[in-house]
């Protein structure tokens, strides 16, 4: 691909956090095939820029550990482990969607499940990136009480990513939920400190604190819009940058 076709691409390695909810579309549960197809093509567009791409997937479309304790009566740790297995299902689905369109990828799990994927090892993950493979990280950080947002921050930092991209259902960070508050204000840029002090729950405190400590910017955008990831990578469209 020529340089003229990829203007303003300033990243060499990025991490995208994909929530489980983003994969279910309008179904209400599980993975929507059309959503997987759209997302895989959006990822391929960025991949074709020559950018090394790693993903962290959530599992909320199948099981939400933190919010499932009350109806199921399970202890929180057990809920979280079930949620980690849900992320594995999503990761394998996304891997297959990518490889259908000839994008080589590897699933690496924080919990050893060697019959279906590799165990996450930092140097192995980086080597896959260097070989031109998309790395899909599953099972969060491998421990209960940590969200997949925190896993995204951790993996992004330890793999030396230039930025962490958080795909949501809105085009950035707002002062309030724009779907409920008409006069909610969208931020083009906001500091980690202000995000935390205003209690804007776009990511959990641990994830934001990790990114802040290591000065890795978090970029929040609407993942549901076709081609939005590639646009944001090129500095186009609407998004919010969280930084110092």
Swiss-Prot record:
Record-level GO cellular component terms: cytosol
SUPFAM superfamilies: Carbamate kinase-like (SSF53633)
Residues that coordinate or bind UMP: 59, 80, 141-148
Pfam families per record: AA_kinase
Pathway assigned to this chain's UniProt record: Pyrimidine metabolism; CTP biosynthesis via de novo pathway; UDP from UMP (UMPK route): step 1/1
GO biological process, one term: 'de novo' CTP biosynthetic process
Entry keyword Transferase: yes
Catalytic function, reaction form: UMP + ATP = UDP + ADP
Enzyme superclass (EC): transferase
Enzyme Commission (EC) number: 2.7.4.22
Span list, region Involved in allosteric activation by GTP: 25-30
Annotated Gene3D superfamilies: Acetylglutamate kinase-like (3.40.1160.10)
Localisation per UniProt entry: Cytoplasm
Keywords assigned: Allosteric enzyme, ATP-binding, Cytoplasm, Kinase, Nucleotide-binding, Pyrimidine biosynthesis, Transferase
Quaternary structure and partners: Homohexamer.
Family assignment from sequence similarity: Belongs to the UMP kinase family.
Protein name: Uridylate kinase
Organism annotation: Ehrlichia canis (strain Jake)
